[in-house]
């Protein structure tokens, strides 16, 4: 089958790779000059297979008024009459209940566990694929006793779904990650997950791209973003780029937030809105792990919604969720918040990186659905497939989403239930 995949971020390029491995004739279309240059470029770097609790949780609405009044709030909302934002917001509010949050957790865990299995299979089959992968575990630290109690309850629920997680006291947390010693008075405890990973998402995109380049059944079209989907009747015929139309038997839309603009004229609404996130990448000193002030274990500050991941000789600091429209312009105030929070939690790491010199501030537009569950599967247009809406979990869920979509396109029974990720759900 001739299949065109739109988008070469981690979701799109994983999809193209999975389809090419099955022998399809694959054309990968991307507006940027290279792979992984959008939201996949400098994300948080955490492969959080067990920590998938949705933003739309039962207690989140009570925090929103306070968040909106804080300069350093983990969530920022720009007042707007944008009907897309209003519709997204109403759906988000409707999802902020225990029943829906538990269901979302189950659905995301099923996809993330499958994604981990496929990532491990990829690494086993490609030992020379270098993307700074490391399994060091993850600590989610809490500053508030009530929030920590809620997290412990979530651990109990996720244990019934196959997750291995442990609640640690503040002292146990610091024993697990000594770089947190300076925050002893600020944290009350943490949830530790031993089998979580870190890696460089952009490096993996480049590695998969290089493998695609070597395959005879793959064509690559970069600097050639899809301007529209070519549909006749209710059947897809291909995509139209600025340079040429590309015919196809099937088209997969995996273009992040840009997917909304492609699908809108067809009146297909996967419920996407960009959650803008930020990162800095701090070069670490020559002392090595344990002496450069940076954590070895991945750390998430639950209250601040900021993650810290050691990726090679870099400390990636990323986070926040801004609902501020469709521009990826850097907000220097949000970047400064990342510096300030790093200085408060890991001051030695910031000093070791020469006070943040060459930290490459970055912003990315994470394509989020209101519930946090991506849309993976067919559309109402015959031959048009969707792989969109992974939010902050794109890196975590990419391999599983690609495998699920490959199963569905091949008309075979998928490895996991497909219904939770369908457009009509």
Swiss-Prot record:
GO terms for cellular component: cytoplasm; plasma membrane. The keyword Flavoprotein applies. It catalyses: a D-alpha-amino acid + A + H2O = a 2-oxocarboxylate + AH2 + NH4(+). Its cofactor is FAD. Its EC number is 1.4.99.-. GO terms for biological process: D-alanine catabolic process. FAD binds at residues 3-17. PANTHER family: D-AMINO ACID DEHYDROGENASE, SARCOSINE DEHYDROGENASE-RELATED. Oxidative deamination of D-amino acids. HAMAP family: DadA. This is D-amino acid dehydrogenase 2. It comes from Ralstonia nicotianae (strain ATCC BAA-1114 / GMI1000). The lineage of its organism: Bacteria, Pseudomonadati, Pseudomonadota, Betaproteobacteria, Burkholderiales.
């Amino acid at each position: 089958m001739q299949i065109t995949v739109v988008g070469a971020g981690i979701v799109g390029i994983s999809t193209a790779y999975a389809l090419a491995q099955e022998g399809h004739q694959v054309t990968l279309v991307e507006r940027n000059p290279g792979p992984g240059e959008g939201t996949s470029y400098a994300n948080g770097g955490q492969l959080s297979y067990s920590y998938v609790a949705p933003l739309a949780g039962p207690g989140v609405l009570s925090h929103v008024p306070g968040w909106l009044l804080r300069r350093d709030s983990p969530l920022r909302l720009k007042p707007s009459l944008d009907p897309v934002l209003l519709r997204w917001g109403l759906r988000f509010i409707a999802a902020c209940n225990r029943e829906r949050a538990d269901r979302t957790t189950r659905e995301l865990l099923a996809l993330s566990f499958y994604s981990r299995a496929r990532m491990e299979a990829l690494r086993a089959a490609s030992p020379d694929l270098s993307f700074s992968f490391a399994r060091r575990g993850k600590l989610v630290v809490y500053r508030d006793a009530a929030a920590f109690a809620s997290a412990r309850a979530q651990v109990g629920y996720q244990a019934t779904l196959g997750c291995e997680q442990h609640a640690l006291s503040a002292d146990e947390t610091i024993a697990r990650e000594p770089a947190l010693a300076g925050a002893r008075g600020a944290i009350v405890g943490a949830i530790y997950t031993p089998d979580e990973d870190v890696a460089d998402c952009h490096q993996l995109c480049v590695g998969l791209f290089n493998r695609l380049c070597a395959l005879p059944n793959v064509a690559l079209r970069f600097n050639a973003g899809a301007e529209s989907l070519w549909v006749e009747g209710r059947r897809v015929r291909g995509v139209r780029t600025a340079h040429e139309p590309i015919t196809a038997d099937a088209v997969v839309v995996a273009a992040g937030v840009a997917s909304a603009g492609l699908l809108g004229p067809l009146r297909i609404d996967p419920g996407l809105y960009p959650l803008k996130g930020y990162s800095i990448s701090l070069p670490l000193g020559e002392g090595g792990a344990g002496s450069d002030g940076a954590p070895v274990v991945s750390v998430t500050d639950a209250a601040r919604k900021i993650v810290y991941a050691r990726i090679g000789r870099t400390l990636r600091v990323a986070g926040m969720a801004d609902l501020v429209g469709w521009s990826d312009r850097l907000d220097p105030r949000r970047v400064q918040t990342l510096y300030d929070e790093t200085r408060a939690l890991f001051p030695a790491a910031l000093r070791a990186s020469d006070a943040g010199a060459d930290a490459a501030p970055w912003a990315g537009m994470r394509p989020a659905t209101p519930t946090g569950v991506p849309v993976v599967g067919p559309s109402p247009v015959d031959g048009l497939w969707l792989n969109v809406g992974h939010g902050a979990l794109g890196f975590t869920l990419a391999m599983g989403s690609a495998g699920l979509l490959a199963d569905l396109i091949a008309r075979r029974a998928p490895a996991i239930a497909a219904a939770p990720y369908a457009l009509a759900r």
